[in-house]
Amino acid sequence: LILNKYTELGYSFYICWSYYKLLFMKSIFKFFILFSVVFDVNSQNLKSPSDFLGYDIGTQFSRHSQVVDYFNHVSEEMDKNTLLINYGKTYERRPLFYAVISSQANIAEIENIRLNNLSALDFNDNRINDKAIVWLSYSVHGNESSSTEASMQTIYELLTKRSDLLENTVVIIDPCLNPDGRDRYANWYNQTTTIPYNTNKISMEHKEPWPGGRANHYLFDLNRDWAWITQVESQQRLNEYQKWMPHVHVDFHEQGINEPYYFAPAAEPYHEVITKWQRDFQFMIGKNNAKYFDENGWLYFTKEIFDLLYPSYGDTYPTYLGAIGMTYEQAGGGVAGLGILNSEGKNLTLVDRVKHHTVAGISTVEISSANSEKLNTEFINFFKNKDDNTTYIMNGDKDKIDQLSRFLKNHKIDFYSSDDQKLSAYSYNKNKTINYSISTADLIIPNYQPKGKLVDVFMERTTKLSDSMTYDITAWSLPFVYGVNGYSTSKKIELKKYKEKKVENLVDKKAIAYAGI
Protein backbone atom coordinates (compact mmCIF):
# COMPACT_ATOMS: atom_id res chain seq x y z
CA LEU A 1 0.00 0.00 0.00
CA ILE A 2 1.46 3.35 -1.03
CA LEU A 3 0.92 6.09 1.55
CA ASN A 4 -0.02 9.23 -0.31
CA LYS A 5 -2.78 11.82 -0.07
CA TYR A 6 -4.76 10.08 -2.82
CA THR A 7 -5.40 6.93 -0.75
CA GLU A 8 -7.72 6.87 2.25
CA LEU A 9 -5.00 5.78 4.69
CA GLY A 10 -2.43 8.00 3.08
CA TYR A 11 -4.77 10.97 3.18
CA SER A 12 -5.45 10.48 6.92
CA PHE A 13 -1.72 10.27 7.56
CA TYR A 14 -1.18 13.41 5.50
CA ILE A 15 -3.82 15.33 7.49
CA CYS A 16 -2.32 14.27 10.84
CA TRP A 17 1.19 15.08 9.72
CA SER A 18 0.10 18.50 8.42
CA TYR A 19 -1.67 19.27 11.72
CA TYR A 20 1.35 18.44 13.89
CA LYS A 21 3.63 20.22 11.46
CA LEU A 22 1.46 23.32 11.87
CA LEU A 23 1.63 23.03 15.68
CA PHE A 24 5.40 22.61 15.52
CA MET A 25 5.81 25.64 13.26
CA LYS A 26 3.58 27.72 15.55
CA SER A 27 5.72 26.70 18.53
CA ILE A 28 8.90 27.68 16.71
CA PHE A 29 7.31 30.97 15.66
CA LYS A 30 6.21 31.69 19.24
CA PHE A 31 9.73 30.92 20.47
CA PHE A 32 11.30 33.39 18.07
CA ILE A 33 8.66 35.99 18.88
CA LEU A 34 9.32 35.49 22.59
CA PHE A 35 13.09 35.68 22.06
CA SER A 36 12.73 38.85 20.01
CA VAL A 37 10.42 40.40 22.59
CA VAL A 38 12.84 39.59 25.42
CA PHE A 39 15.78 41.11 23.51
CA ASP A 40 13.68 44.10 22.50
CA VAL A 41 12.54 44.63 26.08
CA ASN A 42 16.16 44.61 27.24
CA SER A 43 17.06 47.15 24.56
CA GLN A 44 14.05 49.29 25.44
CA ASN A 45 15.01 49.26 29.12
CA LEU A 46 18.47 50.55 28.23
CA LYS A 47 18.36 54.32 28.45
CA SER A 48 20.42 56.59 26.25
CA PRO A 49 23.01 58.72 28.06
CA SER A 50 20.78 61.77 27.58
CA ASP A 51 17.72 60.05 29.09
CA PHE A 52 19.72 58.60 31.96
CA LEU A 53 21.65 61.75 32.85
CA GLY A 54 18.69 64.09 32.43
CA TYR A 55 20.37 66.39 29.91
CA ASP A 56 21.35 66.05 26.26
CA ILE A 57 24.79 64.50 25.96
CA GLY A 58 27.33 67.23 25.29
CA THR A 59 25.32 70.05 26.85
CA GLN A 60 27.06 69.58 30.21
CA PHE A 61 30.28 68.03 31.48
CA SER A 62 29.41 64.83 33.33
CA ARG A 63 31.19 64.10 36.58
CA HIS A 64 33.03 60.79 36.89
CA SER A 65 30.44 59.50 39.35
CA GLN A 66 27.74 60.05 36.72
CA VAL A 67 29.78 58.13 34.15
CA VAL A 68 30.15 55.28 36.64
CA ASP A 69 26.39 55.30 37.23
CA TYR A 70 25.62 55.15 33.52
CA PHE A 71 27.95 52.22 32.87
CA ASN A 72 26.42 50.42 35.85
CA HIS A 73 23.00 51.01 34.27
CA VAL A 74 24.22 49.53 30.97
CA SER A 75 25.66 46.52 32.77
CA GLU A 76 22.42 45.90 34.66
CA GLU A 77 20.07 46.29 31.69
CA MET A 78 22.27 44.48 29.15
CA ASP A 79 23.89 41.97 31.48
CA LYS A 80 24.01 39.22 28.84
CA ASN A 81 25.93 41.52 26.48
CA THR A 82 28.10 43.35 28.98
CA LEU A 83 30.79 42.72 31.56
CA LEU A 84 31.82 45.58 33.84
CA ILE A 85 35.34 45.20 35.21
CA ASN A 86 36.53 47.35 38.12
CA TYR A 87 40.31 47.28 38.03
CA GLY A 88 41.37 49.74 40.70
CA LYS A 89 41.27 53.28 42.00
CA THR A 90 43.10 56.52 41.37
CA TYR A 91 45.19 58.35 43.94
CA GLU A 92 42.07 60.32 44.83
CA ARG A 93 40.11 57.06 45.18
CA ARG A 94 37.98 57.40 42.05
CA PRO A 95 37.09 54.05 40.48
CA LEU A 96 38.89 52.78 37.38
CA PHE A 97 36.83 50.42 35.24
CA TYR A 98 36.06 49.26 31.73
CA ALA A 99 33.14 47.57 29.99
CA VAL A 100 33.43 44.52 27.75
CA ILE A 101 30.56 44.27 25.27
CA SER A 102 29.73 41.71 22.60
CA SER A 103 26.94 39.38 21.49
CA GLN A 104 25.28 37.16 24.09
CA ALA A 105 26.99 34.10 22.62
CA ASN A 106 30.40 35.77 22.80
CA ILE A 107 29.93 37.01 26.35
CA ALA A 108 28.94 33.47 27.39
CA GLU A 109 32.29 32.29 25.95
CA ILE A 110 34.29 35.40 26.80
CA GLU A 111 36.94 33.63 28.88
CA ASN A 112 37.64 31.16 26.08
CA ILE A 113 37.86 34.03 23.59
CA ARG A 114 40.31 35.86 25.85
CA LEU A 115 42.52 32.82 26.43
CA ASN A 116 42.46 31.80 22.78
CA ASN A 117 43.67 35.28 21.87
CA LEU A 118 46.49 35.15 24.43
CA SER A 119 47.66 31.86 22.93
CA ALA A 120 49.25 33.95 20.16
CA LEU A 121 51.99 34.72 22.68
CA ASP A 122 52.71 31.01 23.21
CA PHE A 123 54.85 29.54 20.44
CA ASN A 124 53.59 26.04 21.27
CA ASP A 125 49.88 26.86 21.42
CA ASN A 126 47.86 26.75 18.21
CA ARG A 127 44.39 27.68 19.44
CA ILE A 128 42.34 29.65 16.95
CA ASN A 129 40.36 32.79 17.69
CA ASP A 130 38.16 34.41 15.04
CA LYS A 131 36.83 37.31 17.12
CA ALA A 132 38.28 40.79 16.72
CA ILE A 133 39.12 42.55 20.00
CA VAL A 134 38.94 46.36 19.90
CA TRP A 135 39.92 48.50 22.90
CA LEU A 136 38.74 52.12 23.06
CA SER A 137 40.52 54.35 25.62
CA TYR A 138 39.10 57.77 26.53
CA SER A 139 40.35 60.88 28.37
CA VAL A 140 43.89 59.94 29.34
CA HIS A 141 44.24 63.73 29.43
CA GLY A 142 41.51 64.91 31.77
CA ASN A 143 40.78 68.28 30.19
CA GLU A 144 40.47 66.70 26.73
CA SER A 145 37.10 65.83 28.07
CA SER A 146 34.73 65.23 25.15
CA SER A 147 35.86 61.64 24.74
CA THR A 148 34.45 60.47 28.09
CA GLU A 149 31.07 61.86 27.05
CA ALA A 150 31.52 60.04 23.72
CA SER A 151 32.28 56.76 25.50
CA MET A 152 28.74 56.71 26.92
CA GLN A 153 27.15 57.43 23.55
CA THR A 154 29.39 54.86 21.87
CA ILE A 155 28.49 51.98 24.16
CA TYR A 156 24.80 52.85 23.84
CA GLU A 157 24.84 52.90 20.04
CA LEU A 158 26.90 49.71 19.78
CA LEU A 159 24.41 47.84 21.97
CA THR A 160 21.33 49.20 20.20
CA LYS A 161 21.80 50.54 16.67
CA ARG A 162 25.00 48.63 15.74
CA SER A 163 24.69 45.38 17.67
CA ASP A 164 25.41 43.52 14.40
CA LEU A 165 29.08 44.48 14.80
CA LEU A 166 29.25 42.57 18.07
CA GLU A 167 28.59 39.18 16.49
CA ASN A 168 32.29 38.69 15.73
CA THR A 169 33.83 41.53 17.73
CA VAL A 170 34.58 42.12 21.40
CA VAL A 171 34.72 45.83 22.26
CA ILE A 172 36.42 47.04 25.43
CA ILE A 173 35.56 50.58 26.51
CA ASP A 174 37.54 52.40 29.21
CA PRO A 175 35.56 55.64 29.58
CA CYS A 176 38.18 57.59 31.52
CA LEU A 177 41.83 56.71 32.06
CA ASN A 178 42.38 59.83 34.17
CA PRO A 179 39.32 60.45 36.40
CA ASP A 180 41.19 62.74 38.81
CA GLY A 181 42.30 65.11 36.07
CA ARG A 182 38.96 65.02 34.30
CA ASP A 183 36.94 65.79 37.43
CA ARG A 184 39.40 68.58 38.24
CA TYR A 185 38.53 70.13 34.88
CA ALA A 186 34.79 69.34 34.91
CA ASN A 187 34.30 70.65 38.44
CA TRP A 188 36.20 73.85 37.66
CA TYR A 189 34.22 74.42 34.47
CA ASN A 190 30.84 73.69 36.07
CA GLN A 191 31.65 76.20 38.81
CA THR A 192 32.94 78.87 36.41
CA THR A 193 30.72 78.83 33.33
CA THR A 194 27.87 81.21 32.68
CA ILE A 195 24.36 80.08 31.74
CA PRO A 196 24.09 80.10 28.80
CA TYR A 197 27.77 79.52 28.11
CA ASN A 198 29.89 82.29 26.58
CA THR A 199 31.60 81.47 23.26
CA ASN A 200 34.03 84.41 23.51
CA LYS A 201 37.49 82.94 24.12
CA ILE A 202 38.46 85.77 26.50
CA SER A 203 35.70 84.84 28.97
CA MET A 204 36.67 83.21 32.25
CA GLU A 205 35.26 79.77 31.37
CA HIS A 206 37.92 79.46 28.64
CA LYS A 207 40.82 80.33 30.97
CA GLU A 208 41.53 77.06 32.75
CA PRO A 209 43.85 77.81 35.71
CA TRP A 210 46.96 75.92 36.74
CA PRO A 211 47.41 72.98 37.13
CA GLY A 212 44.54 72.18 34.78
CA GLY A 213 43.01 68.80 34.21
CA ARG A 214 45.49 67.32 31.73
CA ALA A 215 47.56 65.39 34.27
CA ASN A 216 46.69 63.07 37.14
CA HIS A 217 46.82 63.74 40.91
CA TYR A 218 50.63 64.02 40.88
CA LEU A 219 50.51 66.18 37.73
CA PHE A 220 52.00 63.37 35.67
CA ASP A 221 51.13 63.03 31.99
CA LEU A 222 49.60 59.55 31.79
CA ASN A 223 50.07 59.46 28.02
CA ARG A 224 53.83 59.39 28.63
CA ASP A 225 53.52 56.57 31.17
CA TRP A 226 52.46 53.50 29.16
CA ALA A 227 56.01 52.12 29.22
CA TRP A 228 57.38 53.49 32.49
CA ILE A 229 54.22 52.85 34.56
CA THR A 230 55.25 55.16 37.38
CA GLN A 231 51.63 56.06 38.26
CA VAL A 232 49.03 53.85 39.92
CA GLU A 233 46.53 54.39 37.09
CA SER A 234 49.04 53.14 34.52
CA GLN A 235 50.14 50.18 36.64
CA GLN A 236 46.61 48.91 37.11
CA ARG A 237 45.61 49.53 33.50
CA LEU A 238 48.66 47.75 32.07
CA ASN A 239 47.83 44.66 34.08
CA GLU A 240 44.35 44.61 32.51
CA TYR A 241 45.63 45.35 29.02
CA GLN A 242 47.92 42.34 29.17
CA LYS A 243 44.97 40.13 30.08
CA TRP A 244 43.34 40.93 26.74
CA MET A 245 46.03 42.02 24.25
CA PRO A 246 43.58 43.63 21.79
CA HIS A 247 44.03 43.68 18.03
CA VAL A 248 43.05 47.35 17.73
CA HIS A 249 43.56 50.14 20.26
CA VAL A 250 42.32 53.72 19.91
CA ASP A 251 43.51 56.50 22.21
CA PHE A 252 41.03 59.42 22.08
CA HIS A 253 42.44 62.94 22.51
CA GLU A 254 41.77 66.60 21.80
CA GLN A 255 43.94 69.30 20.23
CA GLY A 256 43.75 73.03 19.44
CA ILE A 257 40.35 74.57 18.69
CA ASN A 258 41.29 75.49 15.10
CA GLU A 259 42.32 71.99 14.03
CA PRO A 260 40.14 69.58 12.03
CA TYR A 261 39.72 66.02 13.30
CA TYR A 262 42.79 63.77 13.09
CA PHE A 263 42.72 60.00 12.61
CA ALA A 264 44.99 57.30 11.14
CA PRO A 265 47.17 56.75 9.23
CA ALA A 266 49.92 58.27 11.35
CA ALA A 267 52.75 60.53 10.25
CA GLU A 268 56.33 59.38 9.72
CA PRO A 269 58.52 58.32 11.41
CA TYR A 270 57.15 54.83 11.97
CA HIS A 271 59.36 52.61 14.08
CA GLU A 272 61.05 49.90 12.03
CA VAL A 273 59.42 47.02 13.97
CA ILE A 274 55.96 48.09 12.76
CA THR A 275 54.79 45.54 10.21
CA LYS A 276 53.44 46.14 6.73
CA TRP A 277 50.03 44.88 7.89
CA GLN A 278 49.94 47.36 10.76
CA ARG A 279 50.69 50.16 8.30
CA ASP A 280 48.15 48.91 5.75
CA PHE A 281 45.31 48.49 8.22
CA GLN A 282 45.82 52.03 9.49
CA PHE A 283 45.02 53.17 5.95
CA MET A 284 41.94 50.92 5.83
CA ILE A 285 40.68 52.37 9.11
CA GLY A 286 41.37 55.90 7.90
CA LYS A 287 39.39 55.34 4.70
CA ASN A 288 36.42 53.98 6.63
CA ASN A 289 36.49 56.94 9.02
CA ALA A 290 36.79 59.33 6.08
CA LYS A 291 33.67 57.84 4.49
CA TYR A 292 31.52 58.82 7.48
CA PHE A 293 33.17 62.20 7.94
CA ASP A 294 32.61 62.99 4.26
CA GLU A 295 28.95 62.01 4.55
CA ASN A 296 28.56 64.49 7.42
CA GLY A 297 30.67 67.24 5.85
CA TRP A 298 33.20 67.17 8.71
CA LEU A 299 36.80 68.26 8.13
CA TYR A 300 39.67 65.92 8.99
CA PHE A 301 43.35 65.28 8.25
CA THR A 302 45.74 62.31 8.37
CA LYS A 303 49.49 61.55 8.13
CA GLU A 304 50.53 64.77 9.86
CA ILE A 305 52.01 65.63 13.28
CA PHE A 306 51.36 62.38 15.18
CA ASP A 307 53.99 59.71 14.48
CA LEU A 308 54.54 56.16 15.76
CA LEU A 309 57.93 56.14 17.48
CA TYR A 310 58.31 56.77 21.23
CA PRO A 311 57.07 53.60 22.99
CA SER A 312 55.25 55.16 25.93
CA TYR A 313 52.14 56.53 24.18
CA GLY A 314 48.69 55.01 23.96
CA ASP A 315 49.18 54.36 20.24
CA THR A 316 52.79 53.12 20.09
CA TYR A 317 52.90 50.81 23.12
CA PRO A 318 49.93 48.74 21.84
CA THR A 319 51.51 48.78 18.36
CA TYR A 320 54.69 47.18 19.71
CA LEU A 321 52.47 44.47 21.19
CA GLY A 322 50.93 43.56 17.86
CA ALA A 323 47.88 45.85 17.88
CA ILE A 324 46.82 48.50 15.40
CA GLY A 325 47.51 51.42 17.76
CA MET A 326 46.11 54.84 16.89
CA THR A 327 45.58 58.33 18.25
CA TYR A 328 42.36 60.20 17.37
CA GLU A 329 42.40 63.96 17.94
CA GLN A 330 39.32 66.19 18.10
CA ALA A 331 39.51 69.99 18.24
CA GLY A 332 38.82 71.19 21.77
CA GLY A 333 40.81 70.73 24.96
CA GLY A 334 40.64 72.70 28.19
CA VAL A 335 40.05 76.02 26.44
CA ALA A 336 36.94 74.90 24.55
CA GLY A 337 34.32 74.48 27.27
CA LEU A 338 30.76 73.85 26.09
CA GLY A 339 31.29 76.10 23.08
CA ILE A 340 33.88 78.51 21.73
CA LEU A 341 34.34 80.59 18.60
CA ASN A 342 37.46 79.50 16.73
CA SER A 343 39.60 81.72 14.49
CA GLU A 344 37.15 81.20 11.60
CA GLY A 345 34.25 82.42 13.72
CA LYS A 346 32.67 78.97 13.92
CA ASN A 347 31.15 77.76 17.17
CA LEU A 348 32.98 74.61 18.27
CA THR A 349 30.52 72.90 20.64
CA LEU A 350 30.94 69.99 23.00
CA VAL A 351 27.92 68.41 21.28
CA ASP A 352 29.79 68.31 17.96
CA ARG A 353 33.01 67.11 19.59
CA VAL A 354 31.14 64.18 21.12
CA LYS A 355 29.54 63.31 17.76
CA HIS A 356 32.90 63.22 15.98
CA HIS A 357 34.51 60.90 18.54
CA THR A 358 31.44 58.66 18.59
CA VAL A 359 31.34 58.25 14.82
CA ALA A 360 35.10 57.63 14.60
CA GLY A 361 34.95 55.01 17.35
CA ILE A 362 32.04 53.07 15.83
CA SER A 363 33.59 53.30 12.36
CA THR A 364 36.75 51.71 13.76
CA VAL A 365 34.75 48.87 15.29
CA GLU A 366 32.96 48.41 11.96
CA ILE A 367 36.11 48.00 9.84
CA SER A 368 37.65 45.77 12.51
CA SER A 369 34.58 43.55 12.50
CA ALA A 370 34.77 43.27 8.71
CA ASN A 371 38.39 42.09 8.99
CA SER A 372 38.24 39.99 12.15
CA GLU A 373 39.91 36.89 10.67
CA LYS A 374 42.78 38.86 9.13
CA LEU A 375 43.32 40.75 12.38
CA ASN A 376 43.72 37.46 14.23
CA THR A 377 46.04 35.95 11.63
CA GLU A 378 48.34 38.96 11.54
CA PHE A 379 48.28 39.27 15.33
CA ILE A 380 49.65 35.72 15.58
CA ASN A 381 52.26 36.43 12.89
CA PHE A 382 53.48 39.50 14.76
CA PHE A 383 54.67 37.39 17.68
CA LYS A 384 55.91 34.36 15.75
CA ASN A 385 57.93 36.02 12.98
CA LYS A 386 61.40 36.89 14.27
CA ASP A 387 64.23 37.38 11.79
CA ASP A 388 67.17 37.87 14.14
CA ASN A 389 68.33 36.54 17.49
CA THR A 390 69.82 39.12 19.82
CA THR A 391 70.64 38.66 23.49
CA TYR A 392 70.94 41.67 25.79
CA ILE A 393 73.13 41.49 28.90
CA MET A 394 72.87 43.86 31.88
CA ASN A 395 75.03 44.30 34.94
CA GLY A 396 75.47 47.00 37.54
CA ASP A 397 74.50 47.98 41.07
CA LYS A 398 72.09 45.54 42.63
CA ASP A 399 69.41 48.14 43.37
CA LYS A 400 69.43 49.32 39.74
CA ILE A 401 69.29 45.77 38.39
CA ASP A 402 66.40 45.07 40.77
CA GLN A 403 64.52 48.11 39.44
CA LEU A 404 65.12 46.92 35.89
CA SER A 405 63.91 43.41 36.72
CA ARG A 406 60.70 44.85 38.21
CA PHE A 407 60.19 46.85 35.02
CA LEU A 408 60.56 43.69 32.93
CA LYS A 409 58.20 41.74 35.19
CA ASN A 410 55.53 44.41 34.87
CA HIS A 411 55.71 44.14 31.08
CA LYS A 412 55.81 40.33 31.27
CA ILE A 413 59.16 40.21 29.48
CA ASP A 414 61.21 37.10 30.20
CA PHE A 415 64.74 37.48 31.59
CA TYR A 416 67.35 34.99 32.77
CA SER A 417 70.86 34.42 34.05
CA SER A 418 73.67 32.21 32.71
CA ASP A 419 76.93 30.54 33.69
CA ASP A 420 80.28 32.31 33.58
CA GLN A 421 81.55 32.55 30.00
CA LYS A 422 83.45 34.82 27.62
CA LEU A 423 82.12 36.19 24.36
CA SER A 424 82.24 39.10 21.95
CA ALA A 425 79.53 41.70 22.66
CA TYR A 426 78.59 45.24 21.76
CA SER A 427 79.02 47.68 24.67
CA TYR A 428 76.38 50.39 25.04
CA ASN A 429 78.69 52.67 27.03
CA LYS A 430 81.73 52.32 24.75
CA ASN A 431 79.69 52.15 21.54
CA LYS A 432 81.85 49.35 20.15
CA THR A 433 82.31 45.58 20.25
CA ILE A 434 84.48 44.26 23.09
CA ASN A 435 85.40 40.97 24.75
CA TYR A 436 83.04 40.48 27.66
CA SER A 437 82.87 37.94 30.49
CA ILE A 438 79.34 37.01 31.56
CA SER A 439 78.87 36.37 35.29
CA THR A 440 76.07 34.56 37.08
CA ALA A 441 74.91 37.92 38.47
CA ASP A 442 74.16 39.35 35.01
CA LEU A 443 70.57 39.83 33.90
CA ILE A 444 70.02 38.45 30.39
CA ILE A 445 67.14 39.39 28.08
CA PRO A 446 66.76 37.42 24.82
CA ASN A 447 64.68 38.91 22.03
CA TYR A 448 63.67 35.41 20.86
CA GLN A 449 60.53 35.44 23.00
CA PRO A 450 56.92 36.48 22.26
CA LYS A 451 57.51 40.11 23.25
CA GLY A 452 60.83 40.20 21.43
CA LYS A 453 59.90 43.20 19.28
CA LEU A 454 59.02 45.22 22.37
CA VAL A 455 62.38 44.15 23.84
CA ASP A 456 64.19 45.42 20.73
CA VAL A 457 62.37 48.76 20.96
CA PHE A 458 63.18 49.20 24.64
CA MET A 459 66.82 48.23 24.14
CA GLU A 460 67.80 50.11 20.98
CA ARG A 461 70.74 52.40 21.62
CA THR A 462 70.24 54.77 18.69
CA THR A 463 66.76 55.44 17.34
CA LYS A 464 66.41 54.92 13.60
CA LEU A 465 64.43 57.78 12.09
CA SER A 466 62.80 57.76 8.67
CA ASP A 467 62.01 61.46 9.21
CA SER A 468 63.93 63.88 11.42
CA MET A 469 60.71 65.73 12.29
CA THR A 470 59.33 63.85 15.30
CA TYR A 471 56.47 64.57 17.66
CA ASP A 472 58.33 64.08 20.92
CA ILE A 473 60.99 61.98 22.64
CA THR A 474 63.61 60.16 20.54
CA ALA A 475 65.76 58.33 23.14
CA TRP A 476 64.72 55.77 25.78
CA SER A 477 67.30 52.95 25.83
CA LEU A 478 66.90 50.88 29.01
CA PRO A 479 70.61 50.62 29.98
CA PHE A 480 70.84 54.42 30.08
CA VAL A 481 67.43 54.87 31.71
CA TYR A 482 68.37 52.58 34.61
CA GLY A 483 72.06 53.46 34.76
CA VAL A 484 73.40 49.95 34.18
CA ASN A 485 76.01 48.52 31.83
CA GLY A 486 74.41 47.13 28.69
CA TYR A 487 75.74 44.68 26.12
CA SER A 488 74.27 42.87 23.14
CA THR A 489 75.34 39.80 21.19
CA SER A 490 74.00 37.73 18.33
CA LYS A 491 75.26 34.58 20.04
CA LYS A 492 72.60 32.39 21.62
CA ILE A 493 73.38 31.92 25.28
CA GLU A 494 72.34 28.98 27.42
CA LEU A 495 69.76 30.47 29.74
CA LYS A 496 68.91 29.65 33.34
CA LYS A 497 66.20 30.83 35.69
CA TYR A 498 67.08 34.20 37.12
CA LYS A 499 67.55 34.26 40.87
CA GLU A 500 67.45 37.57 42.64
CA LYS A 501 70.06 37.99 45.31
CA LYS A 502 68.57 38.40 48.75
CA VAL A 503 69.55 41.41 50.78
CA GLU A 504 71.35 40.39 53.96
CA ASN A 505 71.29 42.86 56.82
CA LEU A 506 74.19 41.67 58.95
CA VAL A 507 74.61 42.71 62.56
CA ASP A 508 78.10 43.15 63.99
CA LYS A 509 77.81 41.43 67.35
CA LYS A 510 81.04 43.07 68.51
CA ALA A 511 79.82 46.58 67.80
CA ILE A 512 79.99 48.99 70.73
CA ALA A 513 76.56 50.16 71.87
CA TYR A 514 75.99 53.79 72.69
CA ALA A 515 73.07 56.02 73.50
CA GLY A 516 72.51 59.62 72.53
CA ILE A 517 70.69 62.05 74.80
Task: Please name every model-derived segment.
Residues D174-Y292:
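Hydrophobic, small-residue-rich alpha-helical packing segments that form membrane-like cores
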Residues Q44-S145, E149-V170, R224, T230-V232, ...:
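Intrinsic-disorder/low-complexity accessory segments
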Residues K26-L34:
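Sec-dependent signal peptide recognition
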